[in-house]
């Protein structure tokens, strides 16, 4: 997979499009099949989540496929003017096409939080530096700990949360409306901040701001020589992370626990491709380790036979990721 700069795009390159919109969709279940049909007809891969509160997800296809999907969404009465952010690659970073029905399009787990009723103040990327340079502003990264580990804004507070569900409790324990008069928040594409700023407003915080379009929009619009971003930005696809040019970054992913890892970390004794890394070595049972090793063997055999991403190799990787996700959940429950 090789990153592509926007100026060098051709019709054969892949667009990676993150999109979301909070909107009342009382009959969202009826959208699933026609939306999936449009994605499949245009060879769009990735996952879209739909719920009564809106739509969210990241998909990829060649330019024509993405344009056709966005055109279809625009024609739906409630789904016009969707927030989108694009990056580019020479390969599709997804293996499958999915539309999932959900209770929430981003899971916070707090009843009654509605960004359509109350939300923080949006701050444009070109105005963000000035805001977070204000000494009276507390800057909070609302993402998960493994995302923050590889990159964040200068002087940002890390809540050390493993999932977004943990954020409300962290905020209750660490933030006070009487002390923290100005709160600025950010996330990857903006959607988590729609919920987190709405929650903060509900908790009595007055001046609550969030980065419009998230980190991805900031990296797109703010020049590198003016940036206050440090590191790379984690993304939830096969690229793992993107750099300031929105090109694939320097991180790989442990397929046992899905954590980002560097080339140097692959040299550690705990790392075995597809089986374990220093993040998960103590959380993987012998039985899981054996399964992961067998799955990795299948992947390598498929690669040796020259089978493509939609063949046995992809199926092996998908099964491996499913097992890794279950193993990660079990490890968290046991703590």
Swiss-Prot record:
Catalytic activity field: uridine(34) in tRNA + AH2 + O2 = 5-hydroxyuridine(34) in tRNA + A + H2O
Pfam families (UniProt xref): Rhodanese, UPF0176_N
All residue ranges annotated as the Rhodanese domain in the record: 133-227
Active site (catalytic residues): 187
Gene3D superfamilies: 3.30.70.100, Rhodanese-like domain
GO biological process, any: tRNA modification
Listed EC numbers: 1.14.-.-
RNA-binding as UniProt keyword: no
Alphabetical keyword list: Oxidoreductase, tRNA processing
PROSITE patterns assigned to the protein according to its UniProt record, in alphabetical order: RHODANESE_3
Taxonomy, superkingdom: Bacteria
A single GO molecular function term of this UniProt record: oxidoreductase activity, acting on paired donors, with incorporation or reduction of molecular oxygen
HAMAP family the UniProt entry points to: TrhO
NCBIfam families linked to this entry: PRK00142.1-4
Role description: Catalyzes oxygen-dependent 5-hydroxyuridine (ho5U) modification at position 34 in tRNAs.
Protein family per UniProt: Belongs to the TrhO family.
Name used for this protein in its record: tRNA uridine(34) hydroxylase
Organism: Pseudoalteromonas translucida (strain TAC 125)
